[in-house]
């Protein structure tokens, strides 16, 4: 059963819950009647603090906040390329098809297309020993991007007991089953969820040394970017 809390106070995008809600830090929650997406950012002396990622106008004390039990996460898999997302991986182009240019509050759309089938090459077979980072499938996402699906870092070493043949699969369809050393089994798909607050582990990171010339003088002069690097221009929450 989902844990819930009651809104005690609201200050812009920040919502306060009084009492022991049972939520965890970084847990994803749904706020109010419109199920606005939020994240638990503070737990202190019987007070829970939630940051809401949408406009809070009209939200009132007494409304319910429902926990998901999971950290706020994104879905990693084929279909990310060519998509435009907001900060919590909502696909803006898909939302625009249903709600127009202005996003309605509380709108919920799958981050990636869960119905589309991708032709995939399964790179492991029964009996193979796999561990975190082992490539289990390759999908030609675009003409130049080969998407490689891997064993998640959270799964320890195990043995493949079932592997699907090469073919067309949705991103959530099980393609490989592994038996862990403790005897439990895990089904893996082309896509996997990953908490946004936890950095993805890397074996080797190449330094970014080639400039990315944007043609925008304020960026190229004051905020130069590197090819292969990461940049963000943050705005206000809920705007």
List PLM regions with ranges.
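Short alpha-helix capping/helix-loop boundary micro-motifs
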Residues: 13-18, 49-54, 114-125, 159-164, ...
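Residue "hotspots" at secondary-structure boundaries inside conserved domains
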Residues: 21, 57, 72, 122, ...
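P-loop NTPase nucleotide-binding/switch module
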Residues: 97-153, 170-230
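Short, compositionally biased
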Residues: 42-48, 78-89, 145-166, 185-201
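Hydrophobic anchor at the beta1->P-loop junction of P-loop NTPases
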Residues: 233
């Amino acid at each position: 059963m989902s844990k819930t809390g009651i809104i005690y106070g609201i200050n812009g995008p920040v919502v306060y819950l009084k009492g022991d809600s049972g939520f965890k830090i970084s847990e994803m929650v749904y706020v109010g009647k419109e199920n606005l997406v939020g994240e638990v950012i503070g737990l202190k002396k019987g007070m829970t603090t939630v940051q809401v990622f949408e406009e809070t106008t009209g939200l009132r004390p007494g409304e319910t906040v429902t926990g998901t039990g999971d950290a706020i996460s994104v879905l990693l898999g084929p279909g990310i390329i060519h998509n435009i997302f907001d900060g919590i991986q909502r696909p803006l182009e898909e939302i625009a098809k249903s709600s127009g240019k202005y996003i309605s509050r509380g709108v919920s759309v799958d981050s990636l297309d869960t119905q589309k089938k991708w032709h995939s090459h399964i790179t492991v077979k029964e009996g193979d020993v796999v561990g975190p980072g082992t490539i289990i499938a390759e999908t030609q996402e675009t003409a130049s991007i080969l998407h490689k699906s891997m064993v998640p870092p959270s799964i320890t070493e195990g043995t493949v007991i079932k592997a699907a043949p090469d073919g067309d699969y949705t991103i959530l369809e099980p393609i490989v089953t592994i038996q862990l050393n403790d005897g439990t089994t895990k089904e893996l798909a082309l896509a996997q969820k990953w908490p946004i607050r936890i950095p993805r582990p890397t074996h080797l990171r190449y330094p970014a040394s080639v400039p990315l010339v944007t043609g925008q003088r304020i960026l190229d002069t004051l905020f130069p970017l590197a090819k292969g690097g990461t940049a963000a221009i943050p705005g206000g929450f809920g705007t």
